[in-house]
Amino acid sequence: MNENVSIFNRKWSTHDIMITAVLSIALGLLNIPLTYATAYLMAFPTFFPFIMGIGFFPPILVAYLIRKPGVVLLSSLIIMVLGVPFTPYGVMMLGQVLMYGLPLEIVFLIGRYKHFESWFMAIAGIVVSVVGGILYFVSYGILNMDITIQLLAVVETVIGGAVFAGLLSKWIGDAVLKTGVIQ
């Protein structure tokens, strides 16, 4: 698939909605054990920021594959609704739809849903990880720790977001697009 998307290809079709729903359900099921793993890893405040980005890759991957306005919010909604009964966070998962979906949607809007190069995907991952990192810093007391731990957490958040959220989505998305199943 070409990196650029035609401006005339912005309208949603039933096919787009169904593919988004199917991908979101599959990635939502994958997100359930990831949620438990990341919840466990929160006990390690110097390691968690690095892997935090893995939880953000599902909606970024769907955005990369579908490339339509609103796809991140729809995908995030489906993924998080699926996680409500199966994760320890329950209904709080729904707050993540706007908290993480909206910044991602804005990033792709700035790129006019046309830029999906590796650098742009890394930026998308960094943005959403920094938003998640702010919540993590406040709620888990990172701001009360030594400045070196704080700096380490910031660097890990940026690198982890770029790699595990942005670039992982690009790499998996490229492999999926090569198969032709999204055509």
Predicted segments with their positions:
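Membrane-embedded alpha-helical hairpins and interfacial helices in multi-pass inner-membrane proteins
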Residues: H115-Q183
